Curated annotation (Swiss-Prot):
Belongs to the KRTAP type 10 family. Sequence repeats lie at residues 36-40, 41-45, 62-66, 84-88, 94-98, 104-108, 109-113, 114-118, 119-123, 124-128, 131-135, 141-145, 151-155, 156-160, 161-165, 173-177, 183-187, 188-192, 214-218. It comes from the Eukaryota. This is Keratin-associated protein 10-12. In the hair cortex, hair keratin intermediate filaments are embedded in an interfilamentous matrix, consisting of hair keratin-associated proteins (KRTAP), which are essential for the formation of a rigid and resistant hair shaft through their extensive disulfide bond cross-linking with abundant cysteine residues of hair keratins. The matrix proteins include the high-sulfur and high-glycine-tyrosine keratins. GO terms for cellular component: cytosol; keratin filament. Residues 36-218 are annotated as: 19 X 5 AA repeats of C-C-X(3). Pfam families: Keratin_B2_2. Keywords: Keratin, Repeat. Signal peptide: none annotated. Interacts with hair keratins.
């Protein structure tokens, strides 16, 4: 049996590929190039790339039929019940368990930012950080991190590891973060510059210099036994000599 052509824009109706034998006369569209029928769960609607708008939000069979083949279309995300996301093939764990759907995130029903290959990343659109903190994507990263509001951008659920991105002079955020303790814990010197966006120890003691005697945690990163440290690069290294220490 013939099917509709790919050009589906015919007034206010949608022509979908299908056999006329399976549809009633009321769903036939006369102005199509060939005879075709609309699915029984869809009402006449503008063409949405082979996606017809469900009749009602409570019509779960309609959502399953129209949304599952292409769950990322705008027709599904705007008209379907939450079952559209829950039944999605992108990442069910992201669409089903994430508490960010209504609270502070944009609809992430199978958008490209939602269905990451490794882990799901909710898209936050408000100042509140409760979305990422309560997310089930990576609890260790999103729940325990104190950086959401204070000095870091939301970094919930990065594919490999959560790296806080700090802005400002305070390093307390990353020091207490559970994302990367080895990277963000303090060294023997405090950061002398906030040029680097990555919170990492920017001070290292000079070679063959005892740490207790030559690297004192002062705000200026000045060793107790020598001159001011050279802070031209991202790593602030004490410049005291071996004899001075």
């Amino acid at each position: 049996m013939s099917v509709c052509s790919s050009d589906l824009s015919y007034g206010s109706r949608v022509c979908l590929p299908g056999s006329c034998d399976s549809c009633s006369d009321s769903w036939q569209v006369d102005d199509c190039p060939e005879s075709c029928c609309e699915p029984p769960c869809c009402a006449p609607a503008p063409c949405l790339s082979l996606v017809c708008t469900p009749v009602s939000r409570v019509s779960s069979p309609c959502c399953r039929v129209t949304c599952e083949p292409s769950p990322c279309q705008s027709g599904c995300t705007s008209s379907c019940t939450p079952s559209c996301c829950q039944q999605s093939s992108c990442q069910p764990a992201c669409c089903t368990s994430s508490p960010c759907q209504q609270a502070c995130c944009v609809p992430v029903c199978c958008k490209t930012v939602c269905c990451k290959p490794v882990c799901c990343m909710p898209v936050c659109c408000g100042p509140s950080s409760s979305c990422c903190q309560q997310s089930s994507c990576q609890p260790a990263c999103c729940i325990s991190s104190p950086c959401q509001q204070s000095c870091c951008v939301p970094v919930c659920c990065k594919p490999i590891c959560c790296v806080p991105v700090c802005s400002g002079a305070s390093s307390l955020c990353c020091q207490q973060s559970s994302c990367q303790p080895a990277c963000c814990t303090t060294s023997c010197c405090r950061p002398s510059s906030s040029v680097s966006l990555l919170c990492r120890p920017v001070c290292r003691p000079a070679r063959r210099v005892p740490v207790p005697s030559c690297c004192v945690p002062t705000s200026s990163c000045q060793p107790s036994c020598g001159r001011l440290a050279s802070c031209g690069s991202l790593l602030c290294r004490p410049t005291c000599s071996r004899l001075a220490c």
